[in-house]
């Protein structure tokens, strides 16, 4: 009793037939058709918590090989967003797939707790004048509160983990171990103090890590500035001239940072470029300009001048020639000379081919000037931490650097050194928190040296980290080149920050020499022991005399805190080998984060582990893309295109969100919108309907006594198991490669096409009309029992709530506490499995052809349903052999009342002939058969229904 006009996977259940005296085997299930996920999922969350399911999974996994996914900690501030949800769901799916694969895969979630964003929140709530002790107290309380909010939302997503014992970077033990890690790096020789330009945010009042810098468009004055000749004789000699036609001349530079001009201390040319000495008339007098030869024409045109090149030389010839500061004649404070230093970083793409150098405000400037002998105390650094010029700076003291641009340009014009000013739009560094422009600013900081040769190790940090990248597996593969490029080109790591809420760089520094106390490693351990008991507050309260005794008066407590990227970057030490070493292991098998973490957590973790251990803290890195809206646009509240995970969970259910994550190729951008979620919901319904059919039709099946051995099953049942075995192998292989969207594609296709569109469609007749305990029906039930065992486990990592709901109903007394203590199902071997897969591939092709013909006849009015038809096939070769082998069961595969096959010589003679049946319809199975009414006591039944209800039952061998 089946009809391929019905929806796939849905039994045809007319109420009239149910109530008749010849009922079919219509079983039911408590697994509802409607998921009602938003209502039911929170009940499962509570049940998992009440039953301590995570702990039971750990108990069941004891003794298995471990798989460690180390959680990159989200920051403990604000509600989780859709990106957080993607990240946590991906992690949860991977942990669960490894768990099903026979591993002990614990998941310890974590939080990043120190740093600027929380300090800013405390300032907003309580003002900027709080004592440090109160800042620490309130920051700790605030972070704790935020963690609880985020934790609740993560748990709601179906993420299983050690939520009652997560790691937090602000845990006293972790803070202490971080100080110990700093001590180890100091002893190894990686850590040094120096004056260097670092990323500096005026709003933060602190240095920034590379990962805290983002780029936005900014409009600035682009100016061409002339530095007057101070040594005209040397200029003449460099250009091969006996004498200059005039001593009035300029080396002209181009810059988009006018505020750096007051701090100029040198000029740079490329040693191999050709430079021209150009004679021109300007403001009624003859002047000479030094410009890159290739840029002369464009530059003069920009200035509105005409001129001629009177001599040329290579850049190297100009080395060490000095020029006056443009403001030298205005104020004696600028009465210094700027020498030319050759630099290969100078380009001739635009500007003048000459660069001005302010070593306090540019990395290349700093390196160039230092390499030519400039000492730290000679560096001109007038910009204060708040972005204002120091009061001692002539002409512009007290102004912010941004408001000073205008008066600087005006003064340059006044002294005749401004050759051109235009407003220029360019991509410029901004603070990722404040969205305000930042600068490079030379300050005294603590660094980890990338190219320092440490003690007892034969390679530098850069070399060690680059070698570690080669030993790391990347998903997707392009992440390797990205991380390699960042490590290869990065400057020394600025470890210190000028903040309060952070792990202290707990050094004692000599008041006069600036040297660290000679017992620093020993002192750091003593301080760590105090922090372990009382947190970082212990350092704040510490009186130096307690540790230094009589030396205390000669030393100052260092006020710097560690970069928060050092906090999270050392969790492989503080967590994997520290607070959670019993649960976890080092190195981790996998770190998984968004693509921005190549310069964030992946990066800092690699550097710290390379310094501490000589290798990476992870065996593999997985990167996922960012979430965008349905049109591929970045999400923002102003655009109104933000999708909140909480809203999706509360309306559609977390399983819908999980299915969306799994179905999307995470290696690129992940698009989400109401329309996309609507499609995902439809896909979910098809999967759920399939599960409902499977559960319903095994509800009266007891595997302990009813299970039919595979060798004794009907052929199509053996095929179904062989097909599931092949698919399970493919899906598990995808899971092992962290590939989810192919899994979802296979599961959807399996439920819709393989089951709903073929196997279950054929099976309905046998399930509904065969004898309740007949071999034919038990064979079908045995097959779908095996399929369900496998299917629920395969879908559980993704559709965790739905799989658990179905598992409890399906497995009954054997369900245990949860599906998540199971491993992938060992499907029984099918001896002729490969042959059956080949055979049924052919049969499905034929069935598709027949179905098309049936539809044409139905549309033309010849039949109402496929069971009203009789089919005569002509086939050749393997196709004929496959069809003929089914004997009288062929009609069940084609879902027609009669089917026959005749052999022909070749494919050109093959055909499908559909004719309406002339027989009566059986009121029970709906087949049109010659023997309907042949039994006097049961006039409405066909012979096989009479046999199934009152006799020995029909014989089925194949389908």
Swiss-Prot record:
Residues at which Zn(2+) binds: 922, 925, 942, 945
Any Gene Ontology CC annotation: cytosol
Motif ('HIGH' region): 74-84
Motif position, 'KMSKS' region: 634-638
Molecular function in Gene Ontology: aminoacyl-tRNA deacylase activity; ATP binding; isoleucine-tRNA ligase activity; tRNA binding; zinc ion binding
Residues annotated for ATP binding in this entry: 637
Enzyme class, UniProt record, top EC level: ligase
Domain notes: IleRS has two distinct active sites: one for aminoacylation and one for editing. The misactivated valine is translocated from the active site to the editing site, which sterically excludes the correctly activated isoleucine. The single editing site contains two valyl binding pockets, one specific for each substrate (Val-AMP or Val-tRNA(Ile)).
Catalytic activity annotation: tRNA(Ile) + L-isoleucine + ATP = L-isoleucyl-tRNA(Ile) + AMP + diphosphate
Cofactor note: Binds 1 zinc ion per subunit.
Positions annotated to bind L-isoleucyl-5'-AMP: 593
Name of the protein this chain belongs to: Isoleucine--tRNA ligase
Cofactor(s) listed: Zn(2+)
Region (Disordered): 1-33
Domain of life: Bacteria
Gene3D superfamilies assigned: 1.10.730.20, HUPs, Valyl/Leucyl/Isoleucyl-tRNA synthetase, editing domain
